[in-house]
A protein has these predicted regions:
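Solvent-exposed, non-transmembrane segments of extracytoplasmic/periplasmic domains
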Residues: 172-173
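Short, Φ-rich (hydrophobic/aromatic) sequence segments
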Residues: 29, 176-179
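Short, charged alpha-helical interaction segments and adjacent helix-coil junctions
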Residues: 2-3, 63-76, 102, 156, ...
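Accessory alpha/beta interaction modules
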Residues: 1-166
Length: 279
């Protein structure tokens, strides 16, 4: 089985950049599950990638010792549809793991046990631990014992001060929590770019993710400043739709996203359109 490695050709997030490395990933998993896998543990990274748009489809997935396949998603907004998303992800991961020849053979094959984890650090209220079930999404709810298909996702709140035992077991996770917390605090009194820059500098001076931020500081800054997600797109689209009632702008916004436009770039784009139309 191949060694863990990060494919830097594909767009990622600060979270996946930090925890995509084998040692950091094992530290994170050990912190969450209170296990003690060492650096000699056999890890195979199975994160899904979109070759067309050169970006990752899911955040992190990996196989431990050939026994467990773990999928970890990091989110800043709650998504009740995660069980279905995880189902689609795990099906593709199993396709990577299992040979098609074996799949149609007469001998039973074995597959790693799946585990599904979401780490949440958004601003909405969220309990320390929450369980999401695929069966809760069925149009006709059934008793748990009658569900023919089930998938369970465990959501952990990793905001500063929540699930603190995780941070005590992982310096990297503790540092990540502090870093994000500082950005949230600084952005209250300054623009986002300045807040990110200040948080990076303060963390380096205070020995919080020091080596990581010294090596990847500019990359982290750019990721956080221009890192778009679907929630950002939806917020901008809703704002534009309220202003002029033309929901067809959604497609234009999504096209601009694919070209790497930031939220500020897109808002400026539409302002210029409005000014041109009024001349």
């Amino acid at each position: 089985m191949e060694e863990a490695k990060t494919n830097r050709k594909y767009k990622s997030s600060v979270f996946t950049l930090l925890f995509g490395e084998k040692d950091n990933l094992l530290e994170l998993y050990n912190a969450i599950e209170n296990t003690n896998y060492g650096s000699d543990t056999d890890i195979w990274i199975t994160t899904l990638e979109d070759a067309l748009f050169m970006e990752q489809i899911n955040d992190i997935s990996f196989v431990i010792e050939g026994k467990f396949v773990v999928m970890i998603e990091h989110q800043s907004s709650m998504n009740p549809n995660m069980p279905l998303r995880m189902l689609l992800y795990i099906a593709r991961v199993y396709e990577k793991i299992v040979s098609e020849d074996n799949l149609y053979g007469s001998k039973k094959i074995t597959i790693p046990n799946p585990e599904f984890i979401v780490l949440y650090n958004g601003d909405d209220e969220c309990p320390d631990k929450q369980v999401l079930r695929l069966s809760d999404m069925f149009s006709e709810p059934l008793p748990e014992s009658l569900a023919k298909l089930e998938l369970v996702v465990t959501v952990y709140n990793i905001n500063k001060g929540r699930n603190e035992e995780f941070a005590t077991r992982s310096e990297k996770l503790k540092g990540y929590e502090i870093f994000i917390y500082l950005i949230k605090e600084y952005v209250k009194s300054m623009d986002r770019g300045s807040a990110i820059k200040r948080a990076i500098g303060d963390c380096i001076r205070q020995d919080v993710l020091r080596d990581f931020l010294k090596e990847h500081g500019s990359e982290v800054h750019n990721m956080l400043l221009s890192g778009w997600n679907w929630d950002d797109a939806k917020r901008v689209w809703q704002k534009e739709a309220r202003e002029d009632g033309r929901e067809e702008r959604l497609n234009e916004i999504l096209d601009l996203m694919k070209k790497g436009y930031t939220s500020a770039d897109i808002e400026n784009h539409f302002r210029k359109q409005t000014r041109s139309a009024s001349v």
